[in-house]
Amino acid sequence: MPFTKQLKALSDAFHERGIECKWNEPMAGHTSFRIGGMATLVAWPAGQSQIITVLNLWRELGGKCPIAVLGRASNVLIPDRGFHGLIVLTTRAKRVVFAEDEAVDKDAFRLENKFTCQVFAECGASLALLSQSCAKDERGLSGLEFACGIPGTVGGATVMNAGAYGGDMQSILLASEYYDLTNGYTVTLRAEEMGLDYRHSIYLDHPEWIVLNSVMLLNYGSAPDIRARMEFNTQNRRDKQPYELPSAGSVFKRPVDNFAGRMVETVGMKGACVGGAQVSEKHAGFIVNRGGATAADVMELVHRVQDAVEALYHYRLECEIQIVDDGLDPNGPLTWD
């Protein structure tokens, strides 16, 4: 197996520092798709400082084996052959600080006023849980209502500029801090430096930059009104989206002046299956795992949908699910193209 020596050294170093790790971990249980082969080594750092320790060790011990840093893996597809390297799961790095409770470096970001509150969140913090916390009577913070049903982490949402129901991360982000795998430096970017656009940020262009935390600016409002908006969004999701089956959320980026789901349905692909993967019969913008689906099933189904839509509309849908590939397949990396 490639990189065994470096991975063994990493495992030993993690144990010495009290960082939990496991060998040959099945990744299907860690993804919302419930799909994926085994990762050679998986680490669970307990907070941002341990994430930095893990990444520093990876660099110090060679920096050659494949590495992927994931949160709740709600928007990813892991190949059936697995990941022959180190996967870092950040879900235990979930510290959240509200500026009204504890000082945030206000000089580094934007001065708050009586109408707003800065919120600092480590990359592994649950976006949905954070939105629920903001809606409590003692908080009454508005801006994250769109996120109440998004299953990912703050880090993943920052990378993808996640959004729904007219809101997105771009509308609330002040800054984010990242670790650069190429040199070991940590860097803070202001929102205007993050290249935020529809389902895009500069982090997608720089996979070597690992988001450590984000700072958001939320507005004070009526907690009951905030909760009412969240309940409306939640019910809308339940009514229209296939939450009863594993998926990776919306599959395709929204085209200009159209909807991906509508286009997929128009070309007759709603309900189409490949193996255990199916275009949802409830919402054609989703692909669900009906049981036993493989990554290969999903990829083949995505390609069939793209081909069918392109044949009619002369437009190729862009898949927004991220493939976690170790780059070791002799046939080349897996892509949606």
Annotate the PLM regions.
Residues 2-154:
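Anion-binding (especially nucleotide phosphate/pyrophosphate-binding) glycine-rich loop
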Residues 113-114, 160, 289-290:
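Short coil/turn segments at secondary-structure junctions
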Residues 134, 138, 154, 158-162, ...:
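Short, well-ordered alpha-helical segments in soluble proteins
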Residues 39, 74-78, 88, 127, ...:
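Short, flexible micro-motifs
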Residues 41-48, 77-101, 123, 159-191, ...:
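Structural signature of FAD isoalloxazine-binding scaffolds in flavoprotein oxidoreductases
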Residues 21-23, 29, 76, 179-303, ...:
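Phosphate/pyrophosphate- and phosphate-bearing ligand-binding catalytic cores of soluble enzymes
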Residues 75-76, 132-135, 144-148, 161-168, ...:
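A generic local secondary-structure boundary/capping motif
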